[in-house]
Structures are given as structure tokens and as C-alpha cells.
């Protein structure tokens, strides 16, 4: 008998298209055309008598978060490295980071010659807990990075208390949380610094890009120097044709600047963010109910969360269901039914094939350092269990309607009902 599952030759549950991503804001074409004809395509281009798009976006993004300072950057990875260095992290220092995240949470720490210390996560929120972080603090700890993962906001009250008790800077990685808030404050504005990614898949995107926000003027100035080869923006307008960047020599940096094209796109895309987030939240709530009826456990968020941002919708499979089926087979079956990618949760960073410091000569800094950055030394049981049982959907699916959410639930029901077929 032929299985009804599409992955086994049956008929797919859905063939209609899903919402596309990215979705350009109405003002994007004109903004890009303006840059194209401006004669200034980067922050280091000649001043043309008006504010750069980079400055305009920095102001808009800072205002959106209620903070005085935003420094745009080339990527989220660049932003994290800039924030860490601006906080004083350097050679041999330890930085506590989540064990369940994209590999950049570890590689950025390596990139500033420091040592990532991977922390296990809370089984419900999938974010680091204050208790787990505090247990890892040593005399070599120099900073803590918290990732607001998928759709959750971490326990910022508890994490802030831990960081303050030990005199450590706390960096929020908000690459997956643009627009989320905690006790009425936007994430990124709750700690020493907040970093963001504007890579293609993010809810605020310019293809690639990033930013660092902060309330600390000195830290913002250090970030400026670090991202522009040791230069910072001038206080006033320069002469026409000159650069707005001043060579102060205060702090050596490198080039991690955002282009004018990207900044122009981001300023326009920011006008859509809240509306799109509202749509995602409403559809996620529908999906929570529908999948909960099937026994799945949607990702939770911390108690202080005011509003969530759904970069990814994550849910744990029902206990006892499909336990003998590889998770990639389950997600493959769901993808075949929906015509939309359903993915396994992130692998724990130390087990991720993309996290391989031993393949880079720049990290061979002596036996002690190499032992400290060896991924094999970390035991992360909750991360490992989560990776075996949690599936995810990209936020584009949440820009649909109630009928789309019903289709997602129907696909899960079908795969759960015929799960035995996946084991053959």
C-alpha cells in the first residue's frame, strides 16, 4: 500500500505559494535610486551636502529603541565583534555564550582572540538562564552574551542582576528579535550593548548588515572607531567632497561599515517592522493553539516579555511521537506536505559542523588556548535534547493568514498520523 505522505509518493497537502521574503517597503526603489545617483555609495565616500543614509538609519534605529546611540555595521557578526571589543574583551578572556544558537555566537568570540564558554539553555525558552550563566563565571570571565533565540526573550531581569553582581558587561544579541520588548523596553536597550543582524532572512533586512546600539557614549565612540579603520564621524559637516570620517588615532579598527544602499533600504524597511511583527504574533498565537491540540509544545518566552518577535517559530514534537524517526526525516516530510521549508532546530554549537576552530591557523595560539577552545569539552544536555526534538519554520510563513496556519497544523497532523511510514 502506498503511503499518503508526499515524501513517500502521496499527494502533498498544499501546493499554493507562501508569502515571499523579503518584502520591500514602498519607498525602497526610490531610496536605492537616490543613492545610485548621489555620488556617495559608502560612509567613506565624499560628502555631498546632506546627511548620509548611514547617519539617517542610525538615528531612526536609535530612536526606535529609545537609546541615544546606534552604530551601523556590515553584518550581525561584525556588530557582535565590535561590541565585544568595545567592552574590553580580548586575548584569553572568557565570554559566556549560549550553546544553542547560530555558530556566530561562538565564532565572534574566537574572532577577538577570546574563549567562548558555552552555556546550556532553559528547556522552555531555549535561552540561557541566570542560574546557568552564574555557575560558569570564573576569574577569567570578561563578558556575557545573551541571545534572544527564535521568538523568545531571555530573562533579562535575572541576567542583569548576575552581570551587575560580577561587574561584567552584558551584550544582547538581538539578531532574531528586532522589535521585541521586555517590561516595555525594546530588546537591545536593556544591557551594556545590543547587537543586530540585517541578513537576508531576518525580520529587518538589507540583504546583509548589522548594528550596535547603546546608552553609553564612550562605548559608542569605541565602536565607531573599531568599525571604520580607527576613524569616527565628524561633529559637523565637512567641506564638500571631503569625507565625514575623522582620523583621530584613538583606537585602531578595521573596515566593517554598512553601505549607503543597505542603509537606505533599512530606513524604509523599518517603517514596516511593527506591522509585520503584529501579523506574525497573531498567526503564531493561532499556531500555538492548533499545534498544542496535537501535543506539540511551542517555544515559551520569559515572564517579563511584553511583546515577542517571531524570527522563527519553534515547537517541540509530542512526547512519545516519532521518537524512532530522525528529525531530518520528520522535517523533510513536513516540507514535502507544505512546499515550505521546515527545519530542525539548531545543533548545539560545539556539535555544529560549521563550528570548527581547529580548521583555522589563526586560533593555534598555544596548547593551553587550543585546549580551552576545544568544542569537545562542553556538555550541554538540554541543548542536545532540544536539537533532537524541535522543529522550526521561518517567519515568512507567519505573514500569511488563518488558512495558512490551518494548513501548517494539518501537515503536522498528517505526518504524526502516518509517522510509522517514515520509519520504513
Curated annotation (Swiss-Prot):
Keyword terms: Aminotransferase, Antibiotic biosynthesis, Pyridoxal phosphate, Transferase
Gene3D superfamilies: Aspartate Aminotransferase, domain 1 (3.90.1150.10), Type I PLP-dependent aspartate aminotransferase-like (Major domain) (3.40.640.10)
N6-(pyridoxal phosphate)lysine: modified positions: 202
GO molecular function, one term: transaminase activity
Catalytic activity: 2-deoxy-L-scyllo-inosose + L-glutamine = 2-deoxy-scyllo-inosamine + 2-oxoglutaramate; 3-amino-2,3-dideoxy-scyllo-inosose + L-glutamine = 2-deoxystreptamine + 2-oxoglutaramate
Enzyme Commission number, as recorded: 2.6.1.100, 2.6.1.101
Top-level enzyme category: transferase
Pfam families given in the database record: DegT_DnrJ_EryC1
Required cofactor names: pyridoxal 5'-phosphate
Pathway(s) the chain acts in: Metabolic intermediate biosynthesis; 2-deoxystreptamine biosynthesis; 2-deoxystreptamine from D-glucose 6-phosphate: step 2/4; Metabolic intermediate biosynthesis; 2-deoxystreptamine biosynthesis; 2-deoxystreptamine from D-glucose 6-phosphate: step 4/4; Antibiotic biosynthesis; neomycin biosynthesis
Gene Ontology BP terms: antibiotic biosynthetic process; polysaccharide biosynthetic process
Protein family (similarity comment): Belongs to the DegT/DnrJ/EryC1 family. L-glutamine:2-deoxy-scyllo-inosose/scyllo-inosose aminotransferase subfamily.
Function: Catalyzes the PLP-dependent transamination of 2-deoxy-scyllo-inosose (2-DOI) to form 2-deoxy-scyllo-inosamine (2-DOIA) using L-glutamine as the amino donor. Also catalyzes the transamination of 3-amino-2,3-dideoxy-scyllo-inosose (keto-2-DOIA) into 2-deoxystreptamine (2-DOS).
Protein name according to UniProt: L-glutamine:2-deoxy-scyllo-inosose aminotransferase
Organism: Streptomyces fradiae
Amino acid at each position: 500500500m502506498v503511503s499518503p505522505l508526499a515524501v513517500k509518493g502521496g499527494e502533498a497537502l498544499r501546493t499554493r505559494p507562501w508569502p515571499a521574503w523579503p518584502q520591500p517597503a514602498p519607498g525602497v526603489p526610490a531610496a536605492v535610486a537616490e543613492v545610485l545617483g548621489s555620488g556617495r555609495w559608502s560612509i567613506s565616500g565624499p560628502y555631498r551636502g546632506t546627511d548620509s543614509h548611514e547617519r539617517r538609519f542610525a538615528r531612526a534605529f536609535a530612536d526606535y529603541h529609545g537609546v541615544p546611540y546606534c552604530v551601523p555595521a556590515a553584518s550581525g557578526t561584525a556588530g557582535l565583534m565590535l561590541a565585544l571589543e568595545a567592552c574590553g574583551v580580548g586575548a584569553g578572556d572568557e565570554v559566556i555564550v549560549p550553546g544553542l544558537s547560530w555558530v556566530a555566537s561562538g565564532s565572534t568570540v574566537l574572532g577577538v582572540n577570546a574563549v567562548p564558554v558555552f552555556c546550556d539553555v532553559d528547556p522552555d525558552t531555549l535561552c540561557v538562564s541566570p542560574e546557568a550563566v552564574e555557575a560558569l563565571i570564573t576569574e577569567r570571565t570578561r563578558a556575557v552574551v545573551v541571545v534572544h533565540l527564535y521568538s523568545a526573550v531571555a530573562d533579562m531581569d535575572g541576567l542583569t542582576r548576575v552581570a551587575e553582581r560580577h561587574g561584567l558587561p552584558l551584550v544582547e544579541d538581538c539578531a532574531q528579535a528586532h522589535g521585541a520588548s521586555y517590561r516595555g523596553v525594546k530588546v537591545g536597550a536593556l544591557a551594556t550593548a545590543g547587537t543586530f543582524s540585517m541578513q537576508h532572512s531576518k525580520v529587518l533586512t538589507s540583504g546583509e548588515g548589522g548594528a550596535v546600539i547603546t546608552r553609553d557614549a564612550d562605548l559608542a565612540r569605541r565602536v565607531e572607531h573599531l568599525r571604520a579603520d580607527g576613524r569616527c564621524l565628524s561633529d559637523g559637516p565637512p567641506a564638500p567632497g571631503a569625507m565625514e570620517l575623522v582620523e583621530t588615532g584613538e583606537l585602531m579598527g578595521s573596515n566593517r561599515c554598512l553601505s549607503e544602499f543597505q542603509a537606505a533600504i533599512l530606513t524604509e524597511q523599518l517603517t514596516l517592522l511593527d506591522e509585520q511583527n503584529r501579523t506574525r504574533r497573531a498567526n503564531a498565537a493561532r499556531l500555538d493553539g492548533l499545534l498544542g491540540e496535537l501535543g506539540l509544545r511551542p517555544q515559551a518566552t520569559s515572564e517579563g516579555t511584553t511583546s515577542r518577535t517571531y524570527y522563527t517559530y519553534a515547537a517541540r514534537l509530542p512526547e512519545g511521537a516519532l521518537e524512532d524517526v530522525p528529525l531530518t526525516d520528520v522535517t523533510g516530510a513536513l516540507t514535502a506536505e507544505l512546499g515550505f521549508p521546515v527545519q530542525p532546530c539548531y545543533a548545539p554549537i560545539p556539535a555544529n559542523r560549521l563550528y570548527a576552530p581547529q580548521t583555522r591557523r589563526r586560533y593555534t595560539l598555544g596548547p593551553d588556548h587550543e585546549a580551552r577552545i576545544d568544542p569537545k569539552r562542553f556538555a550541554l544536555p538540554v541543548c542536545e535534547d532540544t536539537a533532537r526534538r524541535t522543529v522550526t519554520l521561518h517567519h515568512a510563513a507567519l505573514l500569511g493568514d488563518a488558512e495558512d496556519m490551518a494548513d501548517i497544523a494539518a501537515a503536522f497532523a498528517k505526518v504524526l498520523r502516518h509517522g510509522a511510514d517514515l520509519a520504513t
